[in-house]
Amino acid sequence: MIERYSREEMSNIWTDQNRYEAWLEVEILACEAWSKLGDIPAEDVKKIRENAKVDVARAQEIEQETRHDVVAFTRQVSETLGEERKWVHYGLTSTDVVDTALSYVIKQANEIIKKDLERFIDVLAQKAKDYKYTLMMGRTHGVHAEPTTFGVKMALWYTEMKRNLERFKQVRKEIEVGKMSGAVGTFANIPPEIEAYVCEHLGLDAAPVSTQTLQRDRHAYYVATLALISTSMEKFAVEIRNLQKTETREVEEAFAKGQKGSSAMPHKRNPIGSENITGIARVIRGYVTTAYENVPLWHERDISHSSAERIMLPDVTIALDYGLNRFTNIVERLTVFEDNMLANIDKTFGLIYSQRVLLALINKGLAREAAYDKVQPKAMESWETKTPFRTLIEEDATITDLLTKEDLDECFNPKHHLNQVDTIFQRAGLE
């Protein structure tokens, strides 16, 4: 991932240095496991643990000759050891090391993403509580429907991200898995005890069955989950972009002192952060196809997935980490124009209360069809003539014979739409 959309903590996880360090830890743990079985002298393992070092530049130099990164790595590590070097990579195949270490690196990335998600959820919870009763226009098909509250909108985002957190916890169980089962997964030259020891010490589960590789359905599920999380963020970002339109202006991204919105138009204050999140989500989603195409490897393995994963896995984790942090800050600092929200409710001449009038007439004894046929023409006339809907209702004696002024006051009271907000928040776990 390019530096512009990267945070240092996550980027450092995907460096060659950290990857080789993970490989080395797998190699050393395997030696320790062999020692516990009595196959490698404990003193040799001690020397390997104390003296084995990674030198990325040297390993890459050797790779120019070997054309094999793991062989180059083991030879470079061996250069830092004495006679005990013979035990490095003992009984292992390259993918025992690479796949297990990759899962370990992903686990490190997951710890950061988990913190990102939890912080975002906390910010959404606070925003929901802050604006719990802040009335605003609810829109369906982009058209005014009925009032809701900005807090309910935030509660919706909160519950969606809670679901995403649960999905993330589940996919961690699938992806944080190692394997050290040999060339075709049969443990022909390495006992299962080695795998169990290494995985336990790395905080990984051991794959019950594997070939030379971990199966890539795990990685496809993982990338798809990250893509879904990013798509939820995009959904929220698109909402902010729509609500920041000049004609609506119910919210606005924070605009810093000295910030510029346009090189040509000095007045511009654009939702560039939310637009940025939209683009990042597109990038992450684009990798889902790659992840799925990596699943059908040939027989017990091929390496067609390898080149794709070297690009894909750093990109999706770095991009999601960046996106979660940036969007959390956007939501946390979001300006909410409560007066504009109320003003927008009144823009449609009271038409948004048409269902309340319809239900009131039904409650007075009219059949639904008859009530609908009384209300709809008044609503259409209000649209076309820009006459307040209530005025047209009050001018119709066939309606006012059934509905008193008090009845109409209740129909046209926006606070009616707050009646179940407490219930919604309780159901969302926000009380």
Swiss-Prot record:
Q: What does this protein do?
A: Catalyzes two reactions in de novo purine nucleotide biosynthesis. Catalyzes the breakdown of 5-aminoimidazole- (N-succinylocarboxamide) ribotide (SAICAR or 2-[5-amino-1-(5-phospho-beta-D-ribosyl)imidazole-4-carboxamido]succinate) to 5-aminoimidazole-4-carboxamide ribotide (AICAR or 5-amino-1-(5-phospho-beta-D-ribosyl)imidazole-4-carboxamide) and fumarate, and of adenylosuccinate (ADS or N(6)-(1,2-dicarboxyethyl)-AMP) to adenosine monophosphate (AMP) and fumarate.
From the UniProt record, report the name of the gene that encodes this protein. purB
Residues the entry annotates as binding N(6)-(1,2-dicarboxyethyl)-AMP: 4-5, 67-69, 93-94, 212, 263, 268-270, 276, 307-311
This protein's species is Staphylococcus saprophyticus subsp. saprophyticus (strain ATCC 15305 / DSM 20229 / NCIMB 8711 / NCTC 7292 / S-41)
State which Enzyme Commission number(s) the record gives: 4.3.2.2
Q: Please state which protein family the record places this protein in.
A: Belongs to the lyase 1 family. Adenylosuccinate lyase subfamily.
What the entry lists under CDD domains is as follows: Adenylsuccinate_lyase_1
Provide the Gene Ontology terms for cellular component: cytosol
Recorded protein name is Adenylosuccinate lyase
Residues at the active site: H141 (proton donor/acceptor), S262 (proton donor/acceptor)
Query: What lineage, starting at the top, does this entry show?
Result: Bacteria, Bacillati, Bacillota, Bacilli, Bacillales
Pathway(s) served: Purine metabolism; AMP biosynthesis via de novo pathway; AMP from IMP: step 2/2; Purine metabolism; IMP biosynthesis via de novo pathway; 5-amino-1-(5-phospho-D-ribosyl)imidazole-4-carboxamide from 5-amino-1-(5-phospho-D-ribosyl)imidazole-4-carboxylate: step 2/2
Which branch of life, at top level?
Bacteria
SUPFAM superfamilies for this protein? L-aspartase-like
Q: One GO BP annotation here?
A: 'de novo' AMP biosynthetic process
Reaction catalyzed: N(6)-(1,2-dicarboxyethyl)-AMP = fumarate + AMP; (2S)-2-[5-amino-1-(5-phospho-beta-D-ribosyl)imidazole-4-carboxamido]succinate = 5-amino-1-(5-phospho-beta-D-ribosyl)imidazole-4-carboxamide + fumarate
